[in-house]
Amino acid sequence: MELRFDLHIHSEQSFDGCMSLSEIVRLARERGLNGVAICDHDRVLESVPEYDDFLVIPATEISTERGHLLGLFVREPIETRQFSEAVTAIHAQGGLAVIAHPFEHSKDEHRLDDVMSRLDGVEIWNSRADRKNKNANAMARELARKWEMPVTAGSDAHVPEEVGGGVT
């Protein structure tokens, strides 16, 4: 059985999102997904709905000095903006630390070498990343391959049309 998840979506709780959680779930179901991760900027869902046939993963997207970091399966906000501290805080909650769109704003393929061993995965497909760097997703795939890291994909949806644009 194949499961399809969009592991990077923003709700209206993000400063730049506009969709309610119920709208995200409805759209994701219509598009054949089995679940989503709600990765609002620097915050987490106050309550996580449970469905028999659909999974909502509590998550967050943290802005750090090294770029954006997804904390999957976290239920408490991560207050720090320091990359290493944020990874530690995610792990303390039993979450997974995934580097999000690592080359959207930078083409330096070695900029994360010193922290890769602490991460749980690399977002290798982000449907918005190639807008700023046309090679961003290809570079992320190469980073994951080089470090033999698990991978994720997400739409980074901020508007309804984008939901399901990246699927793991």
Predicted ranges, named:
Residues 94, 98-106:
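Aromatic-lined carbohydrate-recognition surfaces of secreted/lumenal glycan-active proteins
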Residues 80-83, 100-101:
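Ordered, amphipathic secondary-structure segments that act as subunit-interaction surfaces
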Residues 41, 102, 127:
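Flexible loop residues that form catalytic
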Residues 6, 10, 24-42, 96-98:
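Divalent metal-dependent hydrolysis catalytic cores, especially in the metallo-beta-lactamase
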Residues 83-91:
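Short, charged N-terminal beta->alpha structural module
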Residues 1-11, 15-17, 21-26, 46-59, ...:
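Charged catalytic cores and adjacent phosphate/nucleic-acid-binding surfaces used
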